[in-house]
Amino acid sequence: MTEPIISFKDFSFQYHSQATPTLQNINVDIYPGEKVLVVGASGSGKSTFANCINGLIPFKTKGNVTGELHINNQDATVSCLHKRSNVVGTVLQDTDGQFIGLTAAEDMAFLLENNCVEQDDMKKNVSYWAEKVDMIEHLNHRPQDLSGGQKQRVSLGGILIHRTPILILDEPLANLDPATGHETLRLLNNIHEETKSTMIIVEHRLEESLDDTFDRVLLFKDGKIIANTTPSDLLKSSKLKEAGIREPLYCTALKYAEVDVESIDNLANLREVCMSEHVKFKVKKWIDKTSSNDDNKYKSEPLLELNEVCVQYSDYSNSVLNNVQLAEVDVESIDNLANLREVCMSEHVKFKVKK
């Protein structure tokens, strides 16, 4: 039987500044090559859990440790941060604090320089992993010239050069827009498939991060693991609600459409779910019914009501809107309805309001 590469046994940790333990009686094994998602609400203990693995706890951040933690068959509590970094690579949420070099290339080559690797080999390694993380065109750029997603990729490339068997990513989607976040997850999955490393992703944005490429999900609540299961089984359970985590909206939609989610084999794979003819039929029926009800509702309700609305900007002497009572404006025709200034500058809106 394969030995776990990470093993927690009755493990608890309490910060010196806290009155109660942040982690309580953690018992979990993670095996070589697994891809694990760690989720939980803010303050649930998920980042502390990750820091115990990468060595920031207890070697940098002090506290009281009880129980056992073994990493790569070594007692993690008697090692040191330097030795741990040879086994566990971490991409921090704040990549600015992890950037060391003056350029992207220098940052990725930092460890190779410390290990006195030959220049030719160093350049080959940097180019290889820069290509893998899609940063080959930005190697000569300074940190301040890179976006948050690009800095993250540089940090990831520097970790991959070290080829550690365990890779931790602490909230990799935190500072990314949805499109970049999706691309980042695709990149991480490709890297996991190529390197066969043990990958642990810590996230609170469940809907954006969860899919069926994860072997397991660890769900934290109040410093405890309340679920250790597959993505699909987690979505079928009530554990997310118990932990204060909103389930993916498509799961909610399926329930509104009266789809039996328990009967769906791979609920974590949205594409497979959408290909089911039974699901298509149920969802279409629900949408048609909802749309019909909405049409009847809006026939008897105004699209927009204004009641004594006044608007004046600091750089304008006159009011843009002054005691407006009602304006039947077609809000569907307004491109940027969320921008009040743009709305008020529209000639169509001005005419309707004046009228």
Roles of regions detected by a PLM:
Residues 178-180:
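Helix N-cap at the start of a conserved alpha-helix in ABC-type nucleotide-binding domains
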Residues 120-138:
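Conserved ABC ATPase "signature" region
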